[in-house]
Amino acid sequence: MSLFTMNEGYGYNDIYSLEESRVTDALKSFKEKVVYLFKRSNEMIVISKNGVTNNAVKQDVEKTANFIEKDIKTVENSNEVSREDLTTLERFKKRLEDKLEKWDKEIKELKFKDEGIGTKVINTIKWSFIQLKRIFTKILKLLVSAISAIYNKIRGVD
């Protein structure tokens, strides 16, 4: 048994390791929230197709989108970003683009003919698609700006 033990809670942390942990925490949070946002958006679409609007789900999706924006800005404004972080952001960018294309197709295919469904339900479904598309487009724009900022930092262009 040694006389001295090292406690991780009191270890030496320099500025770079703190910055790196802040970036990795933001990326982990970003990943979790994007997955959660995809799940909730699918729930929102299913609920709106049934003709019932749920304000709690809409607010939850909006709040999650705002958290994602904060995480993206944290990563974008950091000084220490690796190429792995960049590829992670690019993968999420591709996922969002695919999701938006899928929703565009679904919106175009929404045609209710003689099924007895009222215009209120149709408008609700279209509204939910438009709101989700707006949120994901906003996140996509932030991702693109973050990726370009990270590329410039890696290349040394300010």
Model-derived segments and their meaning:
Residues 34, 41-44, 68-75, 103, ...:
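Non-transmembrane amphipathic alpha-helical segments
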Residues 43-58, 74-86, 111-115:
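Charged, low-complexity interaction regions
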Residues 1-25:
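Short, conserved micro-motifs composed of acidic
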